[in-house]
Swiss-Prot record:
Domain notes: Consists of 3 domains; the N-terminus binds the ribosome, the middle domain has PPIase activity, while the C-terminus has intrinsic chaperone activity on its own.
Protein name: Trigger factor
Record's keyword terms, sorted: Cell cycle, Cell division, Chaperone, Cytoplasm, Isomerase, Rotamase
Database matches in InterPro entries: PPIase_dom_sf (IPR046357), Trig_fac (IPR005215), Trigger_fac_C (IPR008880), Trigger_fac_C_sf (IPR037041), Trigger_fac_ribosome-bd_bac (IPR008881), Trigger_fac_ribosome-bd_sf (IPR036611), Trigger_fact/SurA_dom_sf (IPR027304)
Pfam families: Trigger_C (PF05698), Trigger_N (PF05697)
Enzyme Commission number: 5.2.1.8
Domain of life of the organism encoding this protein: Bacteria
GO CC annotations on file: cytoplasm
A molecular-function term among this protein's GO annotations: peptidyl-prolyl cis-trans isomerase activity
């Protein structure tokens, strides 16, 4: 724990720094501050009261203060608290993450004649040392995957699904079929519990490539209308889903019959011939391979930056991210990989450790990318910001955002879009040649 002081003509501030970026601060204000706050408080109260013999807002100050002393005092304390927080945010080099990061604030004294003091407890932005670029360990880029004939044939099979005959059948499901599933969660034995959909009419291909062995075993050789009820033993999953009974329903078993691709079908896809379609498909697969290489390089750069340096992180952000990732990983294991309760219990500790490590990496990168963005002198154009705002808007509202979107929502979209672009540009800078990262810390 370390203690430091900051001061100007109006305020003096003492802070004590603790682990987890937790800071306790004492803000002392001289009488000029409380006198100004008192004057503003009196003005605010006066304009809202009517006294006999005076027009609204025109009553003498001494009468208003005498009759409405409680309201004046409340407004004085509110204004003084705000002024103290603004001073803390402007003068101190351990600024609060946001107003919401303030855990507690208490006015110790507040007097127009003698000044006042406020105690704050809050989480601050982390202190990040200079980045040792010479220690950056970034592997060489992997070569772009070459597209094989097998890749091309598999691509053609996927294209053929466009022309496939999809026939609902009454026979039991078999390898290669698609099934439509709905999954609901409810509370076992609770007559007032209304089943809640986790998903409805979701299609799955019965194959080793698209299903885990246990999931496939549940829905192989079953017919339309088949139901699987499964109790949830894990207390974590019960808590996440607010229920303890999963009900799968097979809505349909669908037989897929894909034709052989030929010139005629290729022309329906805007190709001149089957060979021309193969050429276009190869170009598409090559572009996908380049994108995969780019994503791998991006991921390597994230890892390299996260491992470059350690520093203290805000504990609430770390805790929130860890809780979110723990939930995602446990639910993914239970509902996507279809682990049993016993299998989930065996994997739980490893999944939680993984979530903890991933959370720390994510929060570190949140602040490190901002530092890289600043040190590298990166920028965001108006066109880039507008494009990313459109992306964020579609994610939140779908294709048709509301016409009466509020200014607050617009500001939120701007902040989210800017954060995403800051992160992406910083990581892409890391993924460039190492020598380009030799910067002088600001």
């Amino acid at each position: 724990m370390s203690s430091r002081d900051f001061s100007n003509d109006l305020f003096s501030i003492n802070i004590e720094e603790n682990a987890g970026c937790v800071v306790s601060a004492k803000v002392q204000a001289n009488p000029l501050v409380t006198q100004k706050c008192h004057k503003e408080a009196l003005k605010t109260v006066k304009k809202n009261v009517v006294l006999p013999g005076f027009r609204k807002g025109k009553a003498p100050d001494n009468i208003v203060e005498s009759r409405y002393s409680t309201q004046v005092e409340q407004e004085l304390r509110r204004l003084f608290l705000r002024a103290s927080f603004e001073a803390l945010s402007q003068m101190c080099d351990r600024k609060p993450l946001s107003p919401k990061a303030v855990r507690s604030s208490a006015i110790d004294t507040c007097n127009p004649v003698n000044g006042g003091s406020v105690s704050f407890l809050y989480e601050a932005f982390p202190v990040i040392p200079s980045l040792p670029w010479e220690q950056l360990s970034l592997p060489d880029p992997e070569p772009v995957k070459e597209i094989s004939e097998e890749d091309l044939e598999n691509g053609l099979k996927n294209v053929a699904y466009f022309f496939a005959t999809k026939t609902p059948v009454t026979r039991p499901s078999q390898e290669g079929d698609f099934i439509s599933l709905s999954l609901y969660v409810s509370k076992r034995g609770d007559e007032n519990s209304t089943p809640v959909a986790i998903f409805e009419n979701k299609y799955f291909k019965i194959s080793e490539e698209d299903m885990t062995d246990s999931f496939k075993a549940r829905f192989l050789n079953v017919s339309t209308g088949h139901r699987v009820e499964e109790e949830i033993g894990s207390e974590d999953i019960q808590s996440f889903l607010n229920g303890d009974l999963l009900t799968f329903t097979v809505n349909a078993v669908i037989e897929i019959s894909s034709p052989e691709m030929d010139d005629e079908k290729a022309r329906e896809l805007q190709a001149e011939s089957l060979e021309d379609l193969k050429k276009k498909l190869r170009i598409q697969l090559e572009n996908q391979a380049k994108e995969a290489q780019h994503q791998k390089r991006f991921s390597d750069a994230e890892d390299a930056l996260a491992q470059l340096i350690d520093f203290d992180l805000p504990e609430s952000l770390l805790r929130e991210r860890e809780e979110l990732l723990s939930r995602e990983k446990l639910l993914n294991a239970r509902l996507v990989k279809y682990c049993s309760d016993s299998e989930l219990e065996e994997q739980k500790q490893a999944l939680l450790e993984e979530a903890k490590a991933d959370a720390r990496k994510a929060v570190k990168l949140l602040f490190l990318t901002q530092k890289v963005f600043s040190e590298k002198g990166l920028s965001i154009s108006r066109e880039e910001l507008q494009y990313m705002m459109d992306v964020c808007s579609r994610e939140r509202f779908g294709g048709y955002p509301p016409k009466d979107i509020s200014n607050e929502m617009i500001q939120e979209l701007v902040l989210v879009a800017r954060d995403r672009l800051t992160y992406r540009k910083a990581i892409e800078a890391i993924s460039s040649e190492k020598k380009d990262l030799e910067v002088v810390p600001s």
